[in-house]
Design a protein with these regions (language model features):
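Active-site catalytic microenvironments for nucleophilic, acid-base chemistry
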Residues: 2-4, 94, 164
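Catalytic phosphate/nucleotide-handling subdomain of diverse soluble enzymes
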Residues: 160-168
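Short conserved active-site loop signatures built around small residues
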Residues: 155
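Glycine/threonine-rich beta-strand-loop-alpha-helix active-site module
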Residues: 1-69
Length: 168
């Protein structure tokens, strides 16, 4: 956003403040947690203010997402666990959202199934490519689900707490 339109990313905080298309973005996830490779949301931690800001705009939706489970294998167990829990909660919040639909529910259900069946295995052995792939795909399904159904109180409460304590 700032590469094309300048300024500080804080100027684009909120919904629909990006003035137009950005430079085409190719997203390559290195964790299985945020789902940002398939969403129009970007959450950025401002460490100087102990604050997480959210930019929401369809203009920042990645043009392509390249999924390579090998890239997840170097994450420490603590990061793999935190990201996996985040992805599962993305799916859970989308599933119970009042804005949920049959489509978002299908994405959320598949995400919860993939993550639920693989998170312990992946955290225990990040070199397990099959588990890493399931976590990665589950995270992206969760991202699609919450893009359509939105998130809830868990994420609303977690952003200020996690920014203040500098935890994922």
């Amino acid at each position: 956003v700032t590469a094309k339109y300048g300024g500080s990313i804080t100027e684009y905080e909120g919904a629909h403040k990006v003035p137009g298309k950005i430079i085409p973005l190719i997203a390559i996830p290195t964790t299985a947690g945020t789902g940002s490779a398939v969403t129009a949301f970007s959450v950025i931690t401002d460490h100087s203010r102990d604050y997480k800001l959210t930019v929401f705009s369809y203009e920042i939706l990645p043009a392509y997402a390249i999924l390579d489970a090998e890239l997840l294998t170097t994450a420490p167990a603590s990061v793999a666990a935190a990201c996996g829990i985040d992805a599962f909660i993305h799916a859970e919040e989308a599933y119970i959202s009042t804005a949920a639909s049959p489509f978002s529910d299908a994405m959320a259900e598949k995400a919860m199934s993939l993550i639920g069946k693989n998170i312990r295995r992946f955290v225990a052995n990040r070199g397990d490519i099959e588990a890493a792939e399931a976590m990665l795909v589950g995270s992206l399904f969760a991202g699609i689900a919450f893009s359509f159904a939105r998130l809830g109180n868990v994420h609303a409460m977690s952003h200020p707490v996690s920014a203040f304590f500098d935890v994922p």
